[in-house]
Amino acid sequence: MKGWGWLALLLGALLGTAWARRSQDLHCGACRALVDELEWEIAQVDPKKTIQMGSFRINPDGSQSVVEVPYARSEAHLTELLEEICDRMKEYGEQIDPSTHRKNYVRVVGRNGESSELDLQGIRIDSDISGTLKFACESIVEEYEDELIEFFSREADNVKDKLCSKRTDLCDHALHISHDEL
């Protein structure tokens, strides 16, 4: 009878490890997809477009302390994007990396009517995947909203790895993931 107890314990540990890895793959993939979507949206804004930031109070000398900042990376624009960006997760599918056997999430729909030349072989596309990816994305936005705004308010290189791996620890295997854009 003792053997069954050890077997149950071992089975529980293995299932727990598998679930944790699946959960990490999901959150890592959601973070990386979120970064891709935000970078694309920011790039679509006219770089000449600005927004006034600062105090709209009139100083005693009659002047105002207002500063013009680029709209694309303004806190107002980023906050607006974060409110709706996770809806884009329905445009992603799940792919198992043959070498690592880990799940990756890849865009399966072109942006703004672009035709997709993507080979969809080996990519699972269904409402369960997009629903769980959207939920993971919303959780990330809720938990890391300040970090997302901080990172995207100024241009930076390698945002995916810096944000998803180093800052949030959502990805432990970021250097091994290829995450191609359409």
UniProtKB/Swiss-Prot annotation:
Its main location: endoplasmic reticulum. GO terms for biological process: negative regulation of gene expression; regulation of low-density lipoprotein particle clearance. The modification Phosphoserine is found at residue 115. PROSITE patterns: ER_TARGET (PS00014), SAP_B (PS50015). Keywords: Disulfide bond, Endoplasmic reticulum, Phosphoprotein, Signal. Interacts with MYLIP/MIR. This is Protein canopy homolog 2. It comes from Homo sapiens (Human). The gene is CNPY2.
